[in-house]
């Protein structure tokens, strides 16, 4: 888990800084199948964070159709197509004008994106909580091909990979690594609750695994893959229920709870425009990238701009929540 192995991520950061732009498939941590030279700094960080987060990934392979991840069992998942790599990076995910953003928000099916696009929006670890304008929901964009390859494409397959742990004495079913991460979260919070009993009512599990669609959508919920847990929904609402453009709890929700989850690879739905304040989702690749970028910034750089071939790409820059501020702010959350 990230919170328990800081040296692991420090080593990853050092390796990123030393990794040359022209690395080949054979030299970049076992990637094979063709040249991976010329990738942006962000793509290199994404691929390294994916491999560090998921031991099921055996290799990264490139070919005329794009870049693929090869998983155990010879399964392959597309990281990014050749067309996506050749176009302005992440055009399909975030760099959209106001009308396009609104159309995308009203078409949630299009939030099933490539792995590359799913990792682009920067997730900011607590205590930092940026504004969440329309279009800013880091981690709510998902690659369902990747989730199905990791956990199963149907309920029966996912169930076979479930384990059971507990949070504050309540049993929770989650998938493999997520169940181990939740057990570590429970360990972190046990002492916090002992010292601050007022936290306990916020930590009532409303369930982990449940094969179902997202409320109001046709996409599968991450609960379907056993990687999400909801806590105390009566206290921490979902945007469709609250019908508020922004919710005060997005800023005031207890940081000790959020930090305990983030330290073990979970992201919090309170950092989304379409906020889900009860929702914690196991996405270790996103938290790994968040910590790498934070280390780059605190080391004296400015995130991706501190790496060779960094943020500026084909006339565009890496999006940040601050870049998106004010976009669509007048729209209500009715999608």
Task: Locate predicted features.
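Cell-envelope/glycan interface and biosynthesis
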Residues: 49-271
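Bacterial N-terminal signal peptides that target proteins for export
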Residues: 2-13
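Low-complexity, Gly/Ser/Thr/Pro-rich intrinsically disordered linker/tail segments
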Residues: 263, 276-278, 283-335
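Short Lys/Arg-enriched alpha/beta "domain-start" segment
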Residues: 34-55
């Amino acid at each position: 888990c990230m919170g328990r192995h800081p040296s692991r991520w420090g080593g990853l950061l050092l390796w990123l800084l030393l990794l040359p732009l022209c690395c080949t498939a054979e030299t970049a941590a076992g990637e094979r199948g063709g040249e991976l030279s010329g990738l942006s700094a962000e793509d290199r960080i994404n691929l390294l964070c994916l491999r560090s987060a998921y031991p099921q990934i055996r290799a990264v392979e490139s070919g005329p159709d794009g870049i693929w991840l090869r998983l155990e069992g010879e399964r392959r998942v597309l990281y990014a197509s050749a067309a996506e790599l050749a176009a302005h990076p992440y055009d399909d995910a975030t760099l959209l004008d106001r009308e396009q953003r609104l159309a995308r928000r009203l078409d949630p099916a299009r939030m099933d994106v490539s792995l590359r696009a799913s990792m682009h929006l920067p997730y900011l670890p607590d205590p930092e909580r940026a504004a969440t304008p329309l279009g800013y929901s880091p981690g709510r964009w998902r690659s369902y091909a990747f989730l199905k390859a990791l956990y199963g494409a149907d309920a029966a397959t996912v169930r076979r990979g479930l384990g059971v742990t507990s949070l504050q004495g309540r049993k929770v079913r989650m998938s493999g690594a997520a169940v181990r991460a939740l057990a570590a979260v429970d360990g972190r919070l046990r002492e916090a609750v002992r010292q601050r009993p007022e936290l306990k009512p916020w930590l009532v599990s409303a369930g982990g695994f449940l094969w179902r669609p997202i409320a109001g959508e046709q996409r599968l919920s991450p609960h379907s893959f056993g990687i999400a847990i909801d806590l105390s929904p009566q206290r921490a609402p979902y945007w469709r229920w609250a019908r508020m453009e922004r919710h005060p709890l997005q800023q005031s929700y207890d940081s000790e709870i959020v930090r305990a989850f983030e330290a073990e690879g979970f992201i919090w739905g309170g950092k989304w425009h379409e906020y889900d304040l009860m929702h914690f989702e196991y996405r270790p690749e996103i938290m790994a990238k968040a910590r790498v970028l934070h280390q780059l910034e605190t080391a004296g750089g400015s995130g991706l701009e501190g790496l060779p071939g960094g943020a500026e790409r084909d006339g565009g820059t890496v999006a940040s929540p601050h870049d998106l501020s004010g976009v669509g702010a007048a729209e209500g959350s009715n999608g």
